[in-house]
Amino acid sequence: RKQELMNLNELMKARFVELFGDPIKNPKGWDVVKLSKCLERIDNGKSFTCDSNAREGAFPAILKLSAATYGDYRPYENKALLEETQFVESVEVHRGDLLFTRKNTPDLVGMAAYVFETPEKLMMPDLIFRLVTNERMTPIFLWQLINNREFRPVIQGISGGSAKSMSNISKERLKNIEVICPPISEQKKLEGVLEQVDKSKLKKLR
């Protein structure tokens, strides 16, 4: 299973490079803009007191950092809330969201996960941002860009923090990074491929 998932992830990455080239060297000459020009907003998660165990059924729960750390969305990585009444709708995760780990170990900080499907009543912790793009960029394009191997040093370069064990990325620093911004029609070419890939991936995970 793991091997199949790795192969599918490699296929996603290869398609991105095929369409857009190296996002740092930018051999195709795409426009380069600050990320802030492509974002409508960045939403914060929230800090909760929760159980150490995963939820049962649709009981409200908070995602663990590992739900968005490895490039794909893992809703089963969650911790149940202590009380159902603690649920906060504004930080619930929805289909189509792009999650970004703002705090993590230095090598894993600033990874992104796109939400193709999600069970209800799962919420973002305060260690995760939701990146909401505007009409200039698709969330799927930004997801693949952030996790692109050549682009990782840019993300890691804006992380800070005194502790060697944990790095942190602020909204302001994130908004100021420079990104390639191909025409939206080009960006959308990724979507057909990736949605098919992710469906087959979900079947293998069941």
Regions found by a protein language model. Give the residues of each.
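Non-catalytic DNA-recognition/assembly elements of restriction-modification systems
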Residues: 7-46, 176, 181-206
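A short beta-sheet element
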Residues: 64-65, 88-147
